[in-house]
Amino acid sequence: PHMAVDVQDLDVDFLAFSGHKMYAPMGIGVLYAKRELLEQMPPFLCGGEMIDSVSRTGAVWAEVPHKFEAGTVNGAGAYALAEAIRYVQKIGFDFIEEREAKLTKLLMDGMKEIPAVHI
């Protein structure tokens, strides 16, 4: 996200975002969901340690969030995402917004000086 989001204050059911949008590497992201909703949902993939037990009649899924984590976890990406989140929290969204506004103004002012560009 490019701004702070209080999922509890907004009573958000689901929130997803890409890690690379907040300086983490590509290939990692976040899905926030209310636990009660995740507990009602079946997984859409199978694999890894998402299955608690298997019998001849079916399978018992692991507890949330593990039942949605099929396959090998991107450990390096998860670590990098956590560090990116800490970095953004450290510098603050206000700093990011101010910097983006300054860069946008600089770009727009520069583009206005190019005769072939009309804004």
Where are these regions (language model features)?
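Pyridoxal 5′-phosphate
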Residues: P1-I119
